């Protein structure tokens, strides 16, 4: 009987090295492809997510008529808030406009030789836009912070028997403001409505806020404050 001969060929080191190298190159290509897909997905999806995140902060609770329009203090955004409040006043939504004095001051005014308070600047803008000085009221000694400001507004409204308040603030501030006021006014019988100017004037537009540091402070920072408020109050 013939003996079957089996020959085993050992792979040369050169062949093994080439195989290992090819496998490593394949893995590297797959990683680069995955990274490219992730990058393209981010480029496409992130603007949509950023836009949606900005819009989630914007709420509106309308009141056809109110006892007063209340303008939340806003420092550098006082102009858009005063402008919108004046618009609502001209529409006949309320007989008076209330400003809150949070004691923050603006830049130096050479003509007056002092730093005007932001509520004073807001009052001037209201008058320029058709709100008589006699129809502008000021809530003094308001503490810093939206919730503390809401408590001050409740106290003023209660003292003056105001039961329906139409509140004006900047768009991305509306959700936290509405939550704060309703929480602060709970059990008081005060009805709260909220309105805001469209973003894009003194606040960044929803589709491009993330392109500037200021936008991250205004939009992303608002989520941080919301979480803090929900945990604290």
Label every model-predicted segment.
Residues 2-18:
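N-terminal intrinsically disordered, acidic low-complexity segments at the extreme N-terminus
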Residues 14, 204-208, 214, 218:
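Coil-to-alpha-helix initiation sites in intrinsically disordered, low-complexity, charged segments
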Residues 28, 145, 218-221:
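Residue-level recognition of hydrophobic positions within alpha-helical transmembrane segments
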Residues 54-210:
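A structural signal for short, hydrophobic/glycine-enriched beta-strand patches
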Residues 212-233:
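A transmembrane-helix-recognition feature enriched in membrane-embedded lipid enzymes
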């Amino acid at each position: 009987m013939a003996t079957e001969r089996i020959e085993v060929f050992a792979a040369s080191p050169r062949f093994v090295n080439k195989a290992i190298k090819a496998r490593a190159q394949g893995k590297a290509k797959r990683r680069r492809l995955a990274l490219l897909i992730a990058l393209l997905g981010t480029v496409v999806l992130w603007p949509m997510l950023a836009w949606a995140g900005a819009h989630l902060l914007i709420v509106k609770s309308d009141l056809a008529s109110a006892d007063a329009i209340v303008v939340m203090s806003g420092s550098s955004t006082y102009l858009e808030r005063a402008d919108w409040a004046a618009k609502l006043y001209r529409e006949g939504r309320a007989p008076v406009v209330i400003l809150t004095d949070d004691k923050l001051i603006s830049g130096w005014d050479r003509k007056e030789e002092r730093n005007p308070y932001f509520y004073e600047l807001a009052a001037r803008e209201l008058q320029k836009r058709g709100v008589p000085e006699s129809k502008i009221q000021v809530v003094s000694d308001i503490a810093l912070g939206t919730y503390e400001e809401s408590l001050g507004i409740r106290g003023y409204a209660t003292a003056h028997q105001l039961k329906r308040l139409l509140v004006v603030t900047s768009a991305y501030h509306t959700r936290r403001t509405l939550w704060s006021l309703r929480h602060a006014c709970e059990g008081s019988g005060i009805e709260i409505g909220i309105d805001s100017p469209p973003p894009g004037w003194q606040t960044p537009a929803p589709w491009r806020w993330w392109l500037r540091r200021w936008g991250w402070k205004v939009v992303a920072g608002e989520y941080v404050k919301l979480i803090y408020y929900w945990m604290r109050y």
